[in-house]
Regions:
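N-terminal Rossmann-like dinucleotide-binding module
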Residues: 3-28, 32
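Short helix-capping segments at alpha-helix termini
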Residues: 24-27, 53-58, 133, 158-159, ...
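NAD(P)-binding Rossmann-fold cofactor-contacting core
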Residues: 27-50
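A structured beta-alpha segment of the ubiquitous adenosine-cofactor-binding alpha/beta core
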Residues: 53-77, 83-86, 103-112, 123-134
């Protein structure tokens, strides 16, 4: 079996390789293709990946490629973790926000929109090549941020290619809740027996339930979470907000709930998060280039993205082996929440079978959450239209619709700035 990783020169790749090595008995991988446009970086990361695999007795081949069509040919799965414009473009996205007095972030607000405009055409070209060249029914598993928005574009403009979006936030939340329960009870809990009930859009979810072997333990989780917040001098969340909601918000909701605080912290830049990551990556690539290194260094944790390889390889394994496991993914709503539009891509629990991934029927979120979801989904749908058609009016309306976007009198200035700084990666707007 062939699996292709688009953005194979990413510093995350060794973690993914580890995941495949750990599951080789159940997931019989023959060829892992690493595709990247940065040859130098691909050689470093790919060389390290090959040493990792060789150290485990070479259960599969690692093949490096800079040719997209060759890389997706005959693939059973294609995972996407690419970054159009690399880390320099992320830095531009962050400072675009700061320059205009807005949130400057990789996936949220104006930065997330800029990234989506650059990324969507590339992801759709991969889906088209898969339709023509990959194995029949090959699945595209997207990690590229903004993951929900990119998966929304795939669902609308490449519906014939099976696709799903994944993120490490739900599993990180699940593992953190398990740690909390273990601490309280002194008993280690098998993660496979636990299930997190979470719903929303990618980076805009609310965790609202937790079961262990189908027993509801959410009241204990909330009680413990609130007690922790109240004991802290500067808690991450205002305890009253959490007590009223009776849900735990996704970390990224801080940009919406505490916008002023987040804007203030941006004033300290440099370094922005992209600049911090660039330093971490420089160090990681130097370590990866060491011919003696055979397993991922501890510094990889500084890169962020905990549990990334677990999410990816567990999902592929569940799909390949028809396990019927429940995974939290970004997927088209369909009939899972009849009250919400069927064509919305949501982040929600879904059943993973070989025949496909099906969202589990679930109850909708209340108005306080739904209002924000509807607003962000409107922005997402407009951004998809803008990215696919190079439609400046749709891009203008997307900025206007976003609650973290500019006021109406500043939309044009922000849009002009965004399109100008990323002009080489946005040909659809400049024809």
């Amino acid at each position: 079996m062939k699996v292709t990783v688009v953005g194979g020169g990413s510093t995350y790749t060794p973690e993914l390789v580890n995941g495949f090595l750990a599951r080789i008995e159940q997931f019989p991988l023959d060829e892992l293709w690493l595709l990247d446009i940065d040859e130098e970086r691909l050689e470093v990361v790919g060389g390290f990946a090959r040493r990792m695999v060789a150290a485990q007795g070479s259960p599969f081949k690692v093949i490096l490629s800079t040719n997209q069509r060759e890389a997706v040919q005959d693939a059973a799965y294609v995972t996407t973790q690419l970054r159009v414009g690399q880390m320099e473009a992320r830095r531009e996205d962050e400072y675009l926000g700061q320059r205009h007095g807005l949130i400057g972030q990789e996936t949220t607000g104006v930065g997330g929109m800029a990234k989506a405009l650059r990324t969507i055409p590339v992801i759709l070209s991969i889906a088209r090549d898969m339709q023509e060249l990959a194995q029949p029914g090959a699945m595209l598993v997207n990690f590229t941020n903004p993951a929900g928005l990119v998966t929304q574009a795939l669902s609308q403009y490449a519906p014939e290619t099976p696709s799903v979006g994944v993120c490490n936030v739900p599993i990180t939340a699940k593992m953190s809740i398990l740690d909390r329960l273990t601490e309280a009870t002194g008993k280690k809990i098998d993660p496979d027996l636990a299930r997190l009930d979470t719903l929303g859009l990618n980076h805009l979810t609310w965790h609202r339930g937790f079961t262990i072997e189908e027993e509801d333990v959410w009241p204990q989780v909330m009680q413990s979470f609130l007690a922790d917040l109240r004991a802290q001098e500067k808690p991450e969340w205002d305890p009253q907000t959490i007590a009223v909601l009776q849900m735990i918000p996704n970390y990224y909701l801080q940009y919406f709930y505490y916008t002023d605080k987040k804007l203030k912290s941006q004033e300290k830049w440099p370094p922005s998060r992209a600049e911090e990551v660039m330093e971490v990556e420089k160090g990681l690539l130097a370590q990866y280039a060491d011919p003696a290194l055979q397993e991922p260094p501890a510094d990889l944790m500084k890169r962020g993205g905990a549990w990334y390889s677990t999410v990816a390889t567990q999902l592929l394994n569940a799909h390949y082996n028809d396990l019927g496991e429940v995974h939290v993914v970004n997927i088209r709503n369909g009939r899972a929440i009849p009250e919400w539009p069927s064509d919305w891509v949501l982040e929600m629990p879904a059943l993973v079978h070989k025949s496909g991934i099906t969202p589990l029927p679930t109850r909708p979120l209340p108005p306080a959450q739904f209002g924000l979801i509807a607003q962000i989904k409107s922005y997402e749908l407009l951004t998809v239209e803008a990215a696919v058609h190079g439609n400046r009016d749709a891009a203008y309306q997307a900025l206007l619709a976003h609650p973290l976007g500019p006021t109406a009198d500043k939309v044009q200035a922000v849009l002009d700035d965004m399109l100008a700084i990323h002009r080489p990666y946005l040909p659809q707007f400049w024809h």
